[in-house]
Amino acid sequence: MLRILLIDDTPRKIGRLKSALIEAGFEVIDESGLTIDLPERVEAIRPDVVLIDTDSPGRDVLEQVVLVSRDQPRPIVMFTDDSDPDAMRQAIRAGVSAYIVEGIQAQRLKPILDVAMARFESDQAIRAQLQAREQQLAERKRIELAKGM
């Protein structure tokens, strides 16, 4: 069972979303508004997935997503009413694994979270490969530099 940290910008919506998650068989281990220190909360409770529900992802939220993605990588799913392509791009660049526009339905939650998990795992594998290649290149440069001396 996936353990979910639920972040929402309105208490009214948090209740609906929490109910839908529980109905879909997920465990909501913590819930909060958008004004928290997200990296600190993620470190403290170690959720499997962070789910953010917001009318429109603001700069502060995206900055916190960047910090979580960099320091404590895990799938982040964002439900929003903002269908602006620039907002989508910014969220994906920040580290959001799935950006879902217009509505949350209990029957859609499991497939959405499954896709987010798969995308996150794929992204992590690509990042690991890139890091390994960068290390190999740095080692080759050191060897070539040593040969030239």
Protein language model regions, located:
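A short, hydrophobic beta-strand element within the central beta-sheet of small alpha/beta folds
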Residues: 73-83
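C-terminal output helix
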Residues: 86, 104-113
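Conserved acidic segment of CheY-like receiver
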Residues: 1-13, 17-21, 50
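Short hydrophobic/Thr-rich beta-strand motif most characteristic of the beta2 strand and flanking loop
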Residues: 25-34
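Conserved phosphotransfer microenvironments
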Residues: 14, 34-39, 48-68
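C-terminal output/effector regions of signal-responsive regulators
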Residues: 128-149
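Receiver (REC) domain switch/output surface
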Residues: 20, 109-121
